């Protein structure tokens, strides 16, 4: 059956700031306390969406979450009106304010793990929300992510959205950032590659930085998504590269159809994994980048592998990269050699995503890949699909509500909270989502 990959990109939120919340993510740590530009960040992301949509790649948008997220501050013991809660936490425990104001939901590669209908036992598209258990600021995302996905994929005959796994370290799940799908045409059954960093009873794990994904979580997600057991491979990421800042697999590998583009040191027991993929995926091609050409450090600093590998109708592929790759002589030299070599990659497309990159999120972090048949695509909430009208409406919306400069100190401003709620109220109507945010269901949450 014919099917297409639709990229659902996260829209950067109004409180995008640099707080260094993500230990193990070196860009996040390096840019801590710098001032950010939320308006520019949102526009950089929108421009990528629109460019790819104009180039013929189906594209949609996932909206930001409510931030600062007052209900969690109340759970932490701060009371009074919303304004009083903000004032108290800013004075007594400002680190909590930064955590509950994070715009990290923009990296929707971590929102969920997807199983296309061609891979599932019941013939539905399955989406399992990620619990993002390893980082407090990200663990807050799952309930609203679930509401948003149910509002976008609202046809229960075709889509099944599963709640996140229990919030315990044993079941740490980071979503599609640790998941690849390999195969022929999108509509054909594919091989799902789940990548984990640690498993109970296995001493092979990183020592410097945390392994965020567990094998136990990956296995549970595969079960929830009803993936045909014959179409699943579980593989461990190389713990040494996690310790060098590769906190998700999509920082060291990206797949599309029959191609796996990865670093030579991406996986533990890499040669066995590639042999298994060759045996199970028709026409499988591994493009392994040697450490002598690109070091792991350079891969992390440029986000070479946090790229999007997109298929054109003629079978050729385009690699979507952050500007940092073009600015690194060694990486750019390698990429031009890659273009000249015998493989499907025939074009490089570069985007300026500096605002997201400074927090450790490149092109692949910003998108959730969902393979859909034509019938399934028609069943998606049409208001989220990118086109000229939506692009212009979202740009105007960003101009109206977003600040062009934000520091951690600004997060205590009650006006920022009010601006954010008003903006999301308007956005949820624009995207026909209904009342997906807690403040909409609780009448503002004051008290």
Curated annotation (Swiss-Prot):
Query: Which key words are in the record?
Result: Arginine metabolism, Hydrolase
Q: Which residues form a coiled coil?
A: none
Enzyme group, top EC level?
Answer: hydrolase
Record-annotated residues binding substrate? Answer: 19-28, 110, 137-138, 212, 250, 359
Reaction(s) catalysed by this chain's protein: N(2)-succinyl-L-arginine + 2 H2O + 2 H(+) = N(2)-succinyl-L-ornithine + 2 NH4(+) + CO2
- What's a BP term from Gene Ontology annotated to this protein? arginine catabolic process to glutamate
Question: Key word Transferase present in the record?
Answer: no
Gene3D superfamilies named in the record: Succinylarginine dihydrolase
**EC number(s) on file:** 3.5.3.23
Tell me the active site. 174, 248, 365
According to UniProt, this protein's pathway is: Amino-acid degradation; L-arginine degradation via AST pathway; L-glutamate and succinate from L-arginine: step 2/5
Q: Which GO terms describe its molecular function?
A: N-succinylarginine dihydrolase activity
Q: Give the record's subunit note.
A: Homodimer.
Q: What family does this chain come from, according to its entry? A: Belongs to the succinylarginine dihydrolase family.
Q: Briefly, what is this protein's role?
A: Catalyzes the hydrolysis of N(2)-succinylarginine into N(2)-succinylornithine, ammonia and CO(2).
The protein's matches in HAMAP family, at most eight in alphabetical order, are given as: AstB
Q: Which NCBIfam families match?
A: arg_catab_astB, PRK13281.1
Protein name, per record: N-succinylarginine dihydrolase
Species this protein is from:
Escherichia coli O7:K1 (strain IAI39 / ExPEC)
Tell me the organism's taxonomic lineage: Bacteria, Pseudomonadati, Pseudomonadota, Gammaproteobacteria, Enterobacterales
